[in-house]
């Protein structure tokens, strides 16, 4: 009788441990998927910004032809940022720093471009430019929100 109770107690302990380990594993998988999803949202917003840049550069070219160096800086920063990608299943601190650095350079180039464009009142009156600028500002806000969400999840 005593052996029978011991066997049942051992079986119960093993079952409890099994379900606890399974629950921990499922929680880890769920968190990992959450991190991947949050990162993909960050990437989506960065891609949206990169998609707006060619239209912005083309609009500005006609008005600020002699600002070639600034425009080339934006185009080159965009190209560099496009080359730098991260595999969501292999997020490392080093790869995140490299990605953020490339995106930061692009953001700086866009900021310089916007400062230069303050000198062109005709451009500021262009409806297409104003819409692109508003979309770019909205995208920058979305990037900030998605990065915050990613940091909360990660």
Predicted regions and their residues:
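A helix-centric hydrophobic-segment signal that preferentially recognizes long
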Residues: 1-154
């Amino acid at each position: 009788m005593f052996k029978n109770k011991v066997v049942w107690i051992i079986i119960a302990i093993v079952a409890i441990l099994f379900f606890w380990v399974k629950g921990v594993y499922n929680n880890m998988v769920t968190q990992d998927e959450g991190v991947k999803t949050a990162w993909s949202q960050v990437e989506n917003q960065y891609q949206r910004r990169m998609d707006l840049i060619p239209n912005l550069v083309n609009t500005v070219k006609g008005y600020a032809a002699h600002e070639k160096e600034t425009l080339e800086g934006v185009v080159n920063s965009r190209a560099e940022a496009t080359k730098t990608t991260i595999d969501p299943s292999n997020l490392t601190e080093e790869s995140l720093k490299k990605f953020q650095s490339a995106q930061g350079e692009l953001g700086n180039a866009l900021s310089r471009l916007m400062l230069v464009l303050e000198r062109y009142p005709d451009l500021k009156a262009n409806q297409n430019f104003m819409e692109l600028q508003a979309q770019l500002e909205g995208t920058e806000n979305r990037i900030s929100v998605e990065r915050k969400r990613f940091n909360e999840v990660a």
